[in-house]
């Protein structure tokens, strides 16, 4: 009997209401592939960007959204040696995760820690891997530094704040509403700024005695651009990893005024070799296991409600991580 799967698909780019829940016949796995019956899939800002046509990956339409999932292998194609039916497996950066079952290349899989449930796996790994290359590779944060982290109560901002604090940095965090202050403080922020009510750059300069910060971690994008330039110290690093309000309007002449360095990195270039990926995964597993980073899952959505999750993301009112969970 042919296996059926429900998916969240878009046929056009647009707002959250372009997402359609559809039922597909699932093909048999081909050589080097498996069928994964999923327990959970991550809901990332990248999924929203893809839905809007603003992500660097633009698979042909129509397409199933989602990049990260975990579940149990239901069938194995020819030539797959490392996995068998019944194994638990997860994957990163493979388009099509919003599905209760799907075909996945075996080479994209990894074995998640046994002590993490499905929702925690998809809430943890891409976000913590991103935090690793932002904090440990692009600009290695040092003890005693004062740094700026935007969206300090959100899924990524929370991890950046927690990890940077554990490294000895003093984090100035921005949030979009007063009800996010407590979350940002619990994450470790020494100072919290509501950027909708205060000029965050003025506040940062006041906190640092006019010196500015050596690095800003930004996923806001256009709306925070001018303030980031003012908040940075000379030769500071402007690390952008998202653009919730649109891409930052980078101007080389403006960067030149203070010899600023702008970077927007991709994880693929930070795990370009098996050795780099193994080293990153080792550190990521360690900081999750020892509690350096704590995953706060604030929204669990059934597949049929995935549009509601995207609406929440787009409104920039969320804290913590969002996941979609699938029925057994």
Regions found by a protein language model. Give the residues of each.
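C-terminal hydrophobic helical "lid"/dimerization subdomain
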Residues: 2-3, 275-328
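N-terminal glycine-rich beta->alpha transition that marks the start or flank
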Residues: 3, 15-18, 24-70
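A glycine-/small-residue-rich N-terminal strand-loop-strand element
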Residues: 37, 50-51, 70-94, 170
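Mid-domain Rossmann-like dinucleotide-binding core that forms the NAD(H)/NADP(H) cofactor-binding site
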Residues: 122-197
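Glycine-rich phosphate-binding loop and adjacent beta-alpha segment
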Residues: 175, 223-293, 325-328
């Amino acid at each position: 009997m042919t296996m059926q799967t429900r998916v969240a698909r878009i046929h056009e780019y647009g707002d959250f209401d372009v997402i359609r829940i559809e039922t597909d016949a699932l093909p048999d796995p081909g050589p080097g592939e498996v069928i994964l019956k999923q327990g959970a899939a991550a809901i990332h800002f990248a999924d929203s960007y893809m839905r809007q046509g603003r992500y660097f990956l633009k698979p042909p339409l129509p397409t199933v959204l989602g990049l990260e999932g975990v579940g149990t292998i239901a069938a194995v194609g020819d030539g797959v040696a490392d996995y068998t039916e019944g194994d638990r497996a997860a994957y990163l950066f493979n388009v099509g995760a919003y599905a209760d079952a799907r075909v996945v290349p075996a080479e994209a899989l990894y074995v998640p820690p046994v002590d993490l449930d499905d929702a925690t796996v998809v809430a943890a790994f891409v976000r913590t891997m991103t935090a690793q290359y932002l904090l440990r590779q692009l600009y290695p944060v040092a003890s005693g530094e004062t740094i700026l982290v935007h969206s300090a109560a959100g899924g990524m901002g929370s991890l950046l704040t927690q990890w940077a604090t554990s490294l000895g940095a003093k984090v100035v965090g921005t949030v979009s509403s007063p009800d996010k202050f407590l979350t940002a403080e619990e994450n470790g922020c020494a100072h919290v700024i509501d950027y909708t009510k205060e000029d965050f750059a003025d506040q940062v300069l006041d906190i640092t005695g006019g010196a500015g910060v050596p690095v800003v971690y930004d996923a806001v994008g256009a709306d925070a651009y001018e303030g980031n330039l003012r908040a940075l110290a000379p030769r500071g690093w402007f690390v952008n990893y998202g653009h919730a309000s649109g891409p930052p309007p980078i101007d080389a002449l403006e960067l030149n005024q203070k010899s600023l360095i702008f970077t927007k990195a991709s994880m693929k270039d930070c795990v370009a070799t098996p050795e780099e990926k193994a080293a990153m995964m080792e550190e990521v597993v360690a900081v999750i296991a020892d509690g350096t980073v704590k995953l706060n899952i604030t929204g669990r959505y059934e597949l049929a409600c995935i549009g509601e999750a995207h609406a929440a993301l787009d409104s920039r009112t969320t804290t913590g991580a969002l996941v979609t969970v699938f029925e057994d």
